[in-house]
Amino acid sequence: MNFDIPEFLPALPEIAVLGMGCVLLLAVAYGGGQSGKIAYWITQLTLVIAALLTFYFLDYSSQSVTFNGSYIKDSLSDTLKLFIYIIVFAVFLYSRDYLQARALDKGEFYVLGLFGVLGMMVIASAHHFLTLYLGLELLSLSQYAMVALLRNNRWASEAAMKYFVLGALASGMLLYGMSMIYGATGDLHVAAVAEGIGGSGSSQVLVFGVVFIVVGLAFKFGAVPFHMWLPDVYHGAPTAVTLYIGTAPKIAAFALLMRLLVEALGDVQAHWQDMLIILSVLSMAIGNVVAIAQTNLKRMLAYSTIAHVGFLLLGILTGTGVGYAAAMFYVIVYALMSLGSFGMIIFLSRSNFEADRLEDFKGLNERSPWFAFMMLILMFSLAGVPPTVGFYAKWAVIMAIIDKELLWLAVVAVLFSVIGAFYYLRVIKFMYFDSPTEEISLSKRADFRWCMSANGLAMLGLGIFPGALMGLCVAVLG
C-alpha cells in the first residue's frame, strides 16, 4: 500500500481523536486532583476539533476510499459523525455534575468515552468487514468498562458482566458470519462482497453467513429475542453511562447495519428481509408491552429502546432509498430524544440519590415548570404525538413500508405505537397531576440548563420544521 499524505487526509478526524486520546491518557495519569476537570475540557475540545475537521472536508458530491479499500469517506459517514460529535458533547456536559457528586470524575469516564467515539467513527467509515469489526470492538470494550465504573456497586458489576458475556457472544456470531461470507465470496471488502454476490448469486454458505450476521446485529441493537442484556445494563449502570450507551452508539449501529446489510448484502435482501420483519414485530410488541409494567424509569426507557429498534428496522427492511432515509432520520431523532430523557434523570439526581423511579418525577411541574415542560415534550416525542419530531419520524417510516405494500406491517406498527403511548403519558401524569414528595430545590450549572432547554425545544422545532433534517437524510441515502 502506498502511504502518501493525501491518503491520510480523509481519516484526519480519526487521527485527531486518536492523538488527543493519547494526550488525554497522559493528562489523567499526571493531572492529580484536577484530572477530572482537565479530562473534561480536553475531551470537549477534541470533539470540537473533530467536528471542524469533518465539516471542513465535507463533500456530498464525491467519496474517497483509502487504506487499501478498508476506509471510506462519503456523505453517510460524514453526516453520522457530525451527529455523533454533537450528541457525545452533550452527554459529557450532562454527566459532569453527576460524576463529581459520585467521586467518578477522575477522568476514566472521559477516556473511555473518547475511545468509544473513535470506535463509532471507524464503524461509520469502515469499508471492510474487519474494519467494521475492529471499530465495533473498540466501542464495545469501552462500554463494558464504563458500565463497571462503580466497582463496589453490585448492580453495576452484574450489569457489566452480563453485557460483557452477551456482547462477546454477539461479536463471535458476527465474526463467524463474516467468515462464512468470506468463504462464499472470497473477499471481505464491502464493494467486493457486493460484486461477488451479484455475479454468483446466493449459496447455502452465504445464507448461513447472513443469518449469523443478522443475529449478531440484533444482539448489538438489543432487538427481541436478543434483548436480555439491555434492561439490566441500562438499570445497573451509572446514569451518565446509560446516557452514553443509549444515544450515540445507536447511530453507529445504524451505520453498521447500512454497511453490512445494505451495501454488502443488498443483493440477498430476500434472505434478511423476513428476519428483520420478525425481529421488528417482536421488538415492538415486547418492548411496548413490558415497558407498561416498569416502575423504574431507566428500565422503562430500556424497553422503550427495544420498541424503537423495532421501528428503526422497519425502515431498513423496505430495501428502498426512502426507507433508508426514514430510518436514518429516525435513529438521529431517537438519539436526541434519549439524550434529553436520560438528561432529565440526571437533572433530578443528586449526591446519594438516583432519580430513576417514576415516583421521583411527582410534582415536577410545581418544583420546576420549565423543565417539566421539557420532559413533557420529550415524552410526547418518544410516544409519537404531534407536533413533536417523534411523530414525523414514525410517520416517515410507516409511509416507507406502505410504499413497499407492507400494509399489515404498518397497521402493526401503529397499533404498538398506540399501546406504547400509555407509559410515556404516565410520566406526564406524575409530573403534572401528583404532588411532589419532597421540596428540595433543583440546581444545575447554567450550561446544563441551556443545553437541556435546547434539547427539549429541538424536539418541538424539528417536529414543526422537519424538512431540513429529512432533506439531509434523503440527500445522503434517498
UniProtKB/Swiss-Prot annotation:
GO cellular component: plasma membrane
GO biological process, one term: ATP synthesis coupled electron transport
Database matches in InterPro entries: NADH-Q_OxRdtase_suN/2 (IPR010096), ND/Mrp_TM (IPR001750)
Keywords for the protein's UniProt record, in alphabetical order: Cell inner membrane, Cell membrane, Membrane, NAD, Quinone, Translocase, Transmembrane, Transmembrane helix, Transport, Ubiquinone
Transmembrane segments: 8-28, 38-58, 75-95, 109-129, 130-150, 164-184, 206-226, 238-258, 275-295, 306-326, 328-348, 371-391, 405-425, 457-477
Location of the protein in the cell: Cell inner membrane
Catalytic activity: a quinone + NADH + 5 H(+)(in) = a quinol + NAD(+) + 4 H(+)(out)
Topology of the protein relative to the lipid bilayer: Multi-pass membrane protein
EC number: 7.1.1.-
Top-level taxon: Bacteria
Keyword Iron: no
Gene Ontology MF, one: NADH:ubiquinone reductase (non-electrogenic) activity
Pfam families assigned to the protein according to its UniProt record, in alphabetical order: Proton_antipo_M
Annotated family: Belongs to the complex I subunit 2 family.
Quaternary structure annotation from Swiss-Prot or TrEMBL: NDH-1 is composed of 14 different subunits. Subunits NuoA, H, J, K, L, M, N constitute the membrane sector of the complex.
Its job: NDH-1 shuttles electrons from NADH, via FMN and iron-sulfur (Fe-S) centers, to quinones in the respiratory chain. The immediate electron acceptor for the enzyme in this species is believed to be ubiquinone. Couples the redox reaction to proton translocation (for every two electrons transferred, four hydrogen ions are translocated across the cytoplasmic membrane), and thus conserves the redox energy in a proton gradient.
NCBIfam families the record matches: NDH_I_N (TIGR01770), PRK05777.1-5 (NF004442)
Protein's UniProt name: NADH-quinone oxidoreductase subunit N 2
Species for this entry: Nitrosococcus oceani (strain ATCC 19707 / BCRC 17464 / JCM 30415 / NCIMB 11848 / C-107)
Gene it is expressed from: nuoN2
